[in-house]
């Protein structure tokens, strides 16, 4: 909202400067976004009157003017403006004047004729972009008067950035109320005595929709002169408030809206073809608005109709058919209270906004309609003349303002400062809030123009604004200085993120809602948790797996020529669980575990000259997962199994201590082809709780004895997993004290014979390497051979293995 400071000070004039006024408004919640002068700086420009004018002797487009600048002697000015004429009052930049942009005026000769100054256009003074001719000033101005004083150009323009709840401040009167409350300066509100009723003409109005219009007032005014000139003072105020002057009738309506916050509408009475009705629109009705836009109406939009002809979009904009023109003689003046809920969003439906709708959808004073009708009427009669009929004021459904109770103790607790009871009473009085004191409570009845006061905290805010936020002391919060316990056996989400990032993965964050097809294809979930109000039709269900979102990102980036990606996401998934009850962090029937998922696609390592290029594979990602578990990696098992999103022959169920915690594998060929990827990404998904728990390392003394390394190769069934044999070795070491010197065991070779035509290979050779070391003595060959024999016997007994020659 923009307005000139002089207009505000005509209603309330505190003895503080412009900067202090702007500061106080901002600190009270009415943010002053900008202040700027009404005109740029310039000096030496005065009011002058053209006394005589003659053609230039040597230029067809120039004329020689004799002007009176109030100095007692006529000055000669050469001018080329087309509107220069004898008797015209215009600005004169005297010799020595400095205009905006730094231009200095001196004595000059123009085609041989001396010119002692310059007559100015509005653009040359920085007042507007109009440069078609000289700026024409009111004839009543005295020559020689400094034009800055004559036109009040030292005024300041305020621009307020109002919050939606302060609709009462969308007017000069509303801001003036605030200034009066903040400074204690008396307020002079605009008012008008009821005008004499000289005709008895009425226009019948029927309010058929009380939920649309709560109050409707209007009157007939006959014999107006629509061609009357808008007074300069009104035009100046309108222009400085960002409104262009249209015609006297329109300007008066806009002026009162800006001054007291009352939108109104002026109909051409002679164009109204019947009695008025206020109702909701009907399907198929249309209206051409004042802005030239034709709109199709429906029952969600309010209208004012004459007979069956729609004439106005209620509370938003009038229709072109009954608009006033310069030939209008008889008018119907209307002001109403439209319910905010009936106006909100309607203008935006038609892709425009209006000053009226901006105010009505926030709430406009419903009690002062008759007074404002009289104010508008008085201005019309004074400027345009005419005869006024009686005011027809219908109240059918006005808001009921419930009293709001504010406890003084609650106010002190919220603000953190004990505002005296008498000062609270004074604040409410200055704000114009009627109240009663009941013990230590204040019971306030909100005024008709304050739609933002509904609860106790609203009143506490009013106290804080006027009391002054800067008066509330800075009190740092007091709390016990207690270190947050961080169990070493558990790590948080951020620690896990750092671990995954250290493995060359980048974090992404996807929507928790996904396509229903993703749930079916990637998670085998035909009954996902569905959204009641999805943000998009295709994002209609909650995810039960993170894999689909990661694959979508890989596809998106692969289409943009990215050749290598390693991504992870830590987020919640959503599963139906009828047994789950409501809780502080739970929703009944929906389990929301935290999961970690990752995807690797492209080269196993960044492309470089020293390493041959190869695609990332199952075992690369398996190694990453084992690294995440650290000391607990020996408890991991990767069991061949199937999952809807994964390749049926290249996927595994991940188990920790025998409990399933996730999945690992290549993306299913069908989904790889669907994503248009030339090779399959490797994906994994893990339960975060399994990662959060960690085993603390046990400290043990380092042995000073040498390590002995032995290899053992065995023939076993071709389908036997190597992990099963390693588990057998670990079990043997755990139960046999003689094997305590075996420190580690690993598979280092797998060999299969080439299949002969018509025969199937039934055996494979697994070669194991063992590291043996005692902490006290050097192992001799007999002890080493005994340990290897014991391990071999355990493997033979458990897996029917036989030693390879």
UniProtKB/Swiss-Prot annotation:
<feature type="binding site">
    <location>
        <position position="458"/>
    </location>
    <ligand>
        <name>Mg(2+)</name>
    </ligand>
</feature>
<dbReference type="InterPro" id="IPR036690">
    <property type="entry name" value="Fdx_antiC-bd_sf"/>
</dbReference>
<comment type="similarity">
    <text>Belongs to the phenylalanyl-tRNA synthetase beta subunit family. Type 1 subfamily.</text>
</comment>
<dbReference type="InterPro" id="IPR002547">
    <property type="entry name" value="tRNA-bd_dom"/>
</dbReference>
<dbReference type="InterPro" id="IPR009061">
    <property type="entry name" value="DNA-bd_dom_put_sf"/>
</dbReference>
<keyword id="KW-0820">tRNA-binding</keyword>
<keyword id="KW-0648">Protein biosynthesis</keyword>
<dbReference type="InterPro" id="IPR045864">
    <property type="entry name" value="aa-tRNA-synth_II/BPL/LPL"/>
</dbReference>
<keyword id="KW-0067">ATP-binding</keyword>
<dbReference type="Pfam" id="PF03147">
    <property type="entry name" value="FDX-ACB"/>
</dbReference>
<feature type="domain" description="FDX-ACB">
    <location>
        <begin position="703"/>
        <end position="804"/>
    </location>
</feature>
<dbReference type="GO" id="GO:0009328">
    <property type="term" value="C:phenylalanine-tRNA ligase complex"/>
</dbReference>
<dbReference type="GO" id="GO:0000049">
    <property type="term" value="F:tRNA binding"/>
</dbReference>
<dbReference type="InterPro" id="IPR041616">
    <property type="entry name" value="PheRS_beta_core"/>
</dbReference>
<keyword id="KW-0547">Nucleotide-binding</keyword>
<dbReference type="Pfam" id="PF03484">
    <property type="entry name" value="B5"/>
</dbReference>
<feature type="binding site">
    <location>
        <position position="452"/>
    </location>
    <ligand>
        <name>Mg(2+)</name>
    </ligand>
</feature>
<dbReference type="Pfam" id="PF03483">
    <property type="entry name" value="B3_4"/>
</dbReference>
<keyword id="KW-0694">RNA-binding</keyword>
<keyword id="KW-0030">Aminoacyl-tRNA synthetase</keyword>
<dbReference type="InterPro" id="IPR005147">
    <property type="entry name" value="tRNA_synthase_B5-dom"/>
</dbReference>
<feature type="domain" description="B5">
    <location>
        <begin position="399"/>
        <end position="474"/>
    </location>
</feature>
<dbReference type="Pfam" id="PF17759">
    <property type="entry name" value="tRNA_synthFbeta"/>
</dbReference>
<keyword id="KW-0436">Ligase</keyword>
<dbReference type="GO" id="GO:0006432">
    <property type="term" value="P:phenylalanyl-tRNA aminoacylation"/>
</dbReference>
<feature type="domain" description="tRNA-binding">
    <location>
        <begin position="39"/>
        <end position="148"/>
    </location>
</feature>
<dbReference type="GO" id="GO:0005524">
    <property type="term" value="F:ATP binding"/>
</dbReference>
<dbReference type="InterPro" id="IPR020825">
    <property type="entry name" value="Phe-tRNA_synthase-like_B3/B4"/>
</dbReference>
<keyword id="KW-0963">Cytoplasm</keyword>
<dbReference type="Pfam" id="PF01588">
    <property type="entry name" value="tRNA_bind"/>
</dbReference>
<dbReference type="GO" id="GO:0000287">
    <property type="term" value="F:magnesium ion binding"/>
</dbReference>
<comment type="subunit">
    <text>Tetramer of two alpha and two beta subunits.</text>
</comment>
<feature type="binding site">
    <location>
        <position position="462"/>
    </location>
    <ligand>
        <name>Mg(2+)</name>
    </ligand>
</feature>
<dbReference type="GO" id="GO:0004826">
    <property type="term" value="F:phenylalanine-tRNA ligase activity"/>
</dbReference>
<protein>
    <recommendedName>
        <fullName>Phenylalanine--tRNA ligase beta subunit</fullName>
        <ecNumber>6.1.1.20</ecNumber>
    </recommendedName>
</protein>
<feature type="binding site">
    <location>
        <position position="461"/>
    </location>
    <ligand>
        <name>Mg(2+)</name>
    </ligand>
</feature>
<dbReference type="InterPro" id="IPR033714">
    <property type="entry name" value="tRNA_bind_bactPheRS"/>
</dbReference>
<dbReference type="InterPro" id="IPR045060">
    <property type="entry name" value="Phe-tRNA-ligase_IIc_bsu"/>
</dbReference>
<keyword id="KW-0479">Metal-binding</keyword>
<dbReference type="InterPro" id="IPR012340">
    <property type="entry name" value="NA-bd_OB-fold"/>
</dbReference>
<dbReference type="InterPro" id="IPR005121">
    <property type="entry name" value="Fdx_antiC-bd"/>
</dbReference>
<dbReference type="InterPro" id="IPR004532">
    <property type="entry name" value="Phe-tRNA-ligase_IIc_bsu_bact"/>
</dbReference>
């Amino acid at each position: 909202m923009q307005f000139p400071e002089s207009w505000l000070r005509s209603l309330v004039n505190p003895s503080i400067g412009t900067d202090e006024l702007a500061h106080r408004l901002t600190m009270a919640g009415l943010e002053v976004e900008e202040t700027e002068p009404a005109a740029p700086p310039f000096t030496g420009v005065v009011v002058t009157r053209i006394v005589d004018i003659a053609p230039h002797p040597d230029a067809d487009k120039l004329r020689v003017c004799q002007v009176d600048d109030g100095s007692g002697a006529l000055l000669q000015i050469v001018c080329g403006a087309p509107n220069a004429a004898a008797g015209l009052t215009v600005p004169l930049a005297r010799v020595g004047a400095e205009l905006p942009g730094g231009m200095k005026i001196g004595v000059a000769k123009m085609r041989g004729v001396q010119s002692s100054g310059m007559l100015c256009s509005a653009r040359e003074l920085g007042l507007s972009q109009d440069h078609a001719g000289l700026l024409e000033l009111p004839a009543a101005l005295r020559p020689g008067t400094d034009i800055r004083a004559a036109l009040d150009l030292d005024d300041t323009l305020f621009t307020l950035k109002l919050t939606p709840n302060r609709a009462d401040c969308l007017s000069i009167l509303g801001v003036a109320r605030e200034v009066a409350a903040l400074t204690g300066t008396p307020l002079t509100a605009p008012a008008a005595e009821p005008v004499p009723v000289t005709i008895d003409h009425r226009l019948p109005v029927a309010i058929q929709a009380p939920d649309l219009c709560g109050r409707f007032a209007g009157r007939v005014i006959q014999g107006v002169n629509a061609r009357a000139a808008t007074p300069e003072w009104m035009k100046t105020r309108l222009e400085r408030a960002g409104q262009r002057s249209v015609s006297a009738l329109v300007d008066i309506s806009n002026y009162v809206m800006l001054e007291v916050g009352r939108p109104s509408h002026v109909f051409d009475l002679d164009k109204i073809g019947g009695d008025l009705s206020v109702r909701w629109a009907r399907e198929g009705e249309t209206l051409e608005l004042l802005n030239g836009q034709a709109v199709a109406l429906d029952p969600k939009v309010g209208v004012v109709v004459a007979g069956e002809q729609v004439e106005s979009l209620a509370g938003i904009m009038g229709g072109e058919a009954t608009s006033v023109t310069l030939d209008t003689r008889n008018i119907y003046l209307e002001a109403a209270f439209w319910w905010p809920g009936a106006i909100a969003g309607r203008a935006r439906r038609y892709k425009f906004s209006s000053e009226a709708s901006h105010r009505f959808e926030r709430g406009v004073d419903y009690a002062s309609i008759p007074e404002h009708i009289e104010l508008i009427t008085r201005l019309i009669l004074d400027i345009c003349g005419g005869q006024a009929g009686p005011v027809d004021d219908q109240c059918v459904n006005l808001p009921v303002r419930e009293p709001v109770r504010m406890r003084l103790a609650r106010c002190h607790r919220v603000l953190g400062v004990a505002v005296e009871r008498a000062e609270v009473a004074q604040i409410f009085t200055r704000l114009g809030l009627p109240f009663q004191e009941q013990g230590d409570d204040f019971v306030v009845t909100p005024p008709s123009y304050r739609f933002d006061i509904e609860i106790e905290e609203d009143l506490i805010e009013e106290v804080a604004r006027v009391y002054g936020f800067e008066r509330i002391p800075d009190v740092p919060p007091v709390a016990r200085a207690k270190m947050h316990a961080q169990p070493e056996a558990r790590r948080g989400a951020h620690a896990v993120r750092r671990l995954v990032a250290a493995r060359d993965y980048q974090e992404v964050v996807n929507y928790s809602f996904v396509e229903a097809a993703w749930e079916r294809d990637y998670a085998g979930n035909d009954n996902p948790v569905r959204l009641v109000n999805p943000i998009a039709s295709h994002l209609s269900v909650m995810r039960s797996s993170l894999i689909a979102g990661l694959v979508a990102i890989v596809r998106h980036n692969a289409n943009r020529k990215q050749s290598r990606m390693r991504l992870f996401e830590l987020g919640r998934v959503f599963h139906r669980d009828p047994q789950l009850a409501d809780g502080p962090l739970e929703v009944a029937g929906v389990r929301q575990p935290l999961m970690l998922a990752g995807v690797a696609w492209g080269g196993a390592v960044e492309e470089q000259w020293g390493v041959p290029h190869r695609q990332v594979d199952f075992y690369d990602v398996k190694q990453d997962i084992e690294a995440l578990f650290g000391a607990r990696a020996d408890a991991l098992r990767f069991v061949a199994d199937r999952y809807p999103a994964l390749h049926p022959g290249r996927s595994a169920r991940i188990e920790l201590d025998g409990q399933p915690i996730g999945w690992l594998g290549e993306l299913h060929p069908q989904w790889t082809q669907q994503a248009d990827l030339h090779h399959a990404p490797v994906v994994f998904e893990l339960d975060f709780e399994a990662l959060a728990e960690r085993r603390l390392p046990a400290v043990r003394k380092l042995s000073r004895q040498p390590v002995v390394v032995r290899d053992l190769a065995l023939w076993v069934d071709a389908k036997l997993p190597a992990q099963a044999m390693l588990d057998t070795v670990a079990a043997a070491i755990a139960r046999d004290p003689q094997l305590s010197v075996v420190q580690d065991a690993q598979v280092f070779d797998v060999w299969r014979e080439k299949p002969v035509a018509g025969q199937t290979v039934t055996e494979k050779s697994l070669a194991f390497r063992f590291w043996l070391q005692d902490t006290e003595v050097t192992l001799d060959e007999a002890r080493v051979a005994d340990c290897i024999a014991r391990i071999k016997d355990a493997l033979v007994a458990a897996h029917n293995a036989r030693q390879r020659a």
